[in-house]
Amino acid sequence: MQDNEIFEKVQDIVAEQLGIEKKIVTREANFSSDLGADSLDTVELVMAIEEKFSIEIPDEDAEKISNLSQVVDFIKSKLNTISV
């Protein structure tokens, strides 16, 4: 799966979960300070991403992820591990 494809899927999830316009969900937008996500929103985002990509994001990794770029990198690494 390509970088842009992952980004677009995650962008859709974030926009839908947070009820915001897709165009403001950029790669560098911080979930809490830029997009207004609270801790519950973050948990729901992680769950939706896990479901969409059939991966597991451990809590300690989820706590380190603050923007879409980091999510995309994490998903790519997980998918590469699965496919090897």
UniProtKB/Swiss-Prot annotation:
It is found in: Plastid, Chloroplast. Carrier of the growing fatty acid chain in fatty acid biosynthesis. Residues 4-79 form the Carrier domain. InterPro entries: ACP, ACP-like_sf, PP-bd_ACP, Ppantetheine_attach_site. It comes from Pyropia yezoensis (Susabi-nori). Belongs to the acyl carrier protein (ACP) family. 4'-phosphopantetheine is transferred from CoA to a specific serine of apo-ACP by AcpS. This modification is essential for activity because fatty acids are bound in thioester linkage to the sulfhydryl of the prosthetic group. Pathway: Lipid metabolism; fatty acid biosynthesis. This is Acyl carrier protein. One of its GO terms (molecular function) is acyl binding.
